[in-house]
UniProtKB/Swiss-Prot annotation:
GO biological process: translation
Family of this protein: Belongs to the bacterial ribosomal protein bS20 family.
rRNA-binding as UniProt keyword: yes
Record-given protein name: Small ribosomal subunit protein bS20
Region (Disordered) location: 1-25
GO molecular function per UniProt: small ribosomal subunit rRNA binding; structural constituent of ribosome
Length: 84
């Protein structure tokens, strides 16, 4: 651990941000998994919202967000065709 006060504060802040980012990523993964096996349009819209929010907060890159949305929509559409 750091011996300088400002470094200790930075360490505490970093740990706090790390926990927040981990929670956001966990929520993102959970909703994407649920959406891919779902057949409700509202679920897909919620996934888009979470993905965009996570990207805007800087947790994931915007290109990764777009890729996730595309792949989630593709899996969602395939699931709809199987159910129908």
């Amino acid at each position: 651990m750091a011996n300088i006060v400002s470094n200790e504060k930075t360490y505490r802040h970093t740990q706090k941000v790390r926990k927040e980012n981990h929670a956001k990523m966990s929520k993102l993964r959970t909703i994407v998994k649920k959406t891919r096996s779902s057949n409700e349009q509202a679920q897909l819209n919620e996934a888009y919202k979470v993905i965009d929010t996570t990207a805007s907060k800087g947790v994931i890159h915007k290109n990764k967000a777009n890729r996730l949305k595309s792949r989630t929509a593709k899996a969602f559409k395939a699931n709809l065709q199987v159910v129908a």
